[in-house]
Amino acid sequence: HIAGSLDDEINMYTGLMIYNHKMTTVVTPTGSVFSGGTDLFAAGYPRILQRADTSKAIEQNKQVGVHSWAEGDKTAKEFPYTNESHRSQATYFKKVMGDKGIAFYMFTLNSAPASGEHWMTKADSDKYSFITRIE
């Protein structure tokens, strides 16, 4: 299980290493990614999800989760999009996901509040070409 990150800069640096070395990322049947863990998963190609239970929809397995972020008592959407945190995240997702990266980042901001969680559906994944193979 890879959950949220304590340091977004290090997390994005690590993600860019995964991306630059053309590494595959895999969520195993007993694994999951959430928040910063999902950011790392995004850096791989291909991005493979091995479902915990193949009889369930992927969101019911709770293996790939996203949410917004906050800084102190301010939510991400309370910061202007010119803010360094937004620019860094948008640049990261554009780099590792291409043309759908910024739209995916915006999706995470709207998916659930920073204290909440949204487990990605197949429709979510398909819209952003996020999970490249589901097993």
Q: Locations of the language-model features?
A:
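Second-shell loop/turn segments in exported
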Residues: 1-8, 23-30, 74-80, 110-115
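Surface-exposed patches in mature extracellular/periplasmic domains of secreted proteins
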Residues: 2, 27-30, 50-55, 59, ...
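Glycine-rich beta-to-alpha active-site loop
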Residues: 6-10, 14-69
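Charged, glycine-interspersed solvent-exposed loop segments at helix/strand-loop junctions
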Residues: 67-135
